Amino acid sequence: MLQPKRTKFRKVMTGRNRGLAKGTEVSFGDFGLKAVGRGRLTARQIEAARRAMTRHIKRQGQIWIRVFPDKPITEKPLEVRQGKGKGNVEYWVAQIQPGKVMYEMNGVPEELAREAFRLAARKLPIKTTFVTKQVM
């Protein structure tokens, strides 16, 4: 599972997920999976989508993961009263804004890439679209 090796602070405030994304162009591969909506991806969801793509393309080509879960999410245990401080870190998330290219792929035909991204998108809680590299 993806998570930072070390962080400056153990817990962070919830905050808001506003604004526009950086990394909106396909820059490493030929095809990409771009977010249309906004939300959060957990490390497990990122890994599940990666596995779905890798299995479909049968380890040919190359895949880039352009998102990293760097925000800790805390939860209090079940049946614990409120108060007594903030809960423990349970999992890590990546915050996604519209337009962010989350995965990239090359070395495979477009139809195979399209189907692999469709399978990966089923694992994600965000609406996505298939994009190709713009050649100028």
UniProtKB/Swiss-Prot annotation:
Keyword Hydrolase: no
Top-level division of the source organism's lineage: Bacteria
GO cellular component, one term: cytosolic large ribosomal subunit
Example of a GO biological process term: translation
CDD domains documented for this protein: Ribosomal_L16_L10e
InterPro entries in UniProt: Ribosomal_uL16, Ribosomal_uL16_bact-type, Ribosomal_uL16_CS, Ribosomal_uL16_dom, Ribosomal_uL16_sf
SUPFAM superfamilies: Ribosomal protein L16p/L10e
Keywords: Ribonucleoprotein, Ribosomal protein, RNA-binding, rRNA-binding, tRNA-binding
A molecular function (GO) term: tRNA binding
Task of the protein: Binds 23S rRNA and is also seen to make contacts with the A and possibly P site tRNAs.
Family: Belongs to the universal ribosomal protein uL16 family.
Quaternary structure and partners: Part of the 50S ribosomal subunit.
PANTHER family: 50S/60S RIBOSOMAL PROTEIN L16, LARGE RIBOSOMAL SUBUNIT PROTEIN UL16M
Protein name, UniProt field: Large ribosomal subunit protein uL16
Species, as recorded: Aliivibrio fischeri (strain ATCC 700601 / ES114) (Vibrio fischeri)
Gene name in the database record: rplP
